[in-house]
A protein has these predicted regions:
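Non-catalytic accessory regions of SAM-dependent methyltransferases
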Residues: 1-42
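A general structural signal for well-ordered alpha-helical segments in protein cores
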Residues: 5, 24, 50, 60-63, ...
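Secondary-structure boundary/capping signal
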Residues: 16, 20, 35-36, 62, ...
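Conserved SAM/SAH cofactor-binding pocket of Class I
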Residues: 92-143
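Conserved AdoMet
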Residues: 28-99
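Charged catalytic carboxylate motif
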Residues: 4-7, 23, 49, 89-92, ...
Length: 143
């Protein structure tokens, strides 16, 4: 068993992080580029980075911010401070909009306060004739 991964899990569980094992696995792979189940352990540099990220996550910084990106529908978005993290319920909203718009010839869609742009981008990818405009005024939301 990978001791570093176990330590990372224990730290996140102790901090009360929801889905601590999932988060630990994501952080481990992000830092090392390897699967914790098949790895003997991180290098000293990787262990140091893992410790820093574990403390940030234990402090409730969103996993998506730590990773810098997050999958949404069938694509990956840049994510960071200044935007809300795309979540599963955002995918449901986007899928519902796609279902409503898919048979329209040239729907016009405005994604206001777009943040990552996940809703507008998801619709644009799935409804080829859609004219989609994403609007975000906050400079903090721009990568």
């Amino acid at each position: 068993m990978n001791a570093a991964y176990q330590k990372l899990c224990a730290r996140l569980i102790m901090a009360g992080v929801p889905d601590a094992r999932f988060d630990a696995a994501q952080l481990y792979t992000f830092v090392t580029g390897r699967d914790h189940r098949l790895d003997d352990g991180p290098t000293a540099e990787e262990a140091s980075r893992l410790q820093v990220l574990a403390e940030r996550r234990a402090g409730r910084e969103p996993l998506q911010y730590l990773l810098g990106e997050w999958d949404f529908l069938d694509f990956t978005l840049k994510v960071g401070r200044g935007v809300l993290c795309p979540r599963a319920d955002s995918e449901v909203v986007c899928e519902t909009a796609i279902e409503l718009l898919k048979d329209s010839e040239a729907p016009v869609v405005y994604d206001l306060c777009a943040g990552t742009g996940c809703l507008g981008l998801g619709i644009a990818r799935a409804v080829p004739g859609a004219k989609v405009t994403c609007v975000e005024l906050s400079h903090d939301a721009w990568p």
